[in-house]
Amino acid sequence: MGAPAWNRIKSYNFPDHLIRHADNAARIDPYPFDPYADAQWRLRPGLASSSGVSFESVNYPGHYLRHSNYVVGLAANDGSSGFAADATFHRTAGLADGGWTSFRSHNFPDHYLRHANYVLRIDPLSASSSAVDRADATFHIGY
């Protein structure tokens, strides 16, 4: 039996929390929750750059994580270049742990996907950011 066609994305500093969508908001919540499919993602080639990645919802096909005013939510792909750029991220070595993963925004290259108060957003981060900020921006891709 092969690997599933979807991924779950776990928080580094809240390892029982998964990235999910709830009422179109992107957040991390402790597993288990219902519906479980809210935490299942298809990692697609980036909509704005094939070197990146876009997160497509399994239970809402055609809907992707995208940032708007630095807040990340689930939205239907409208086919625009702006949507594509907002929904594309580039994998990097984890800011808190190089064995994990961080996701840099395509159109704000100094901003990374991170959680703050359990809600996903993009913020400017670097190796000199606080340990908490770097941990908030570090994730594990699994099943």
Indicate residue ranges for each PLM-predicted region.
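Short, tandemly repeated low-complexity microdomains enriched for cysteine and small residues
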Residues: 21-42, 67-89, 115-137
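Extracellular glycan-recognition/adhesion modules and their associated mucin-like linkers
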Residues: 1-25, 43-71, 90-118, 140-143
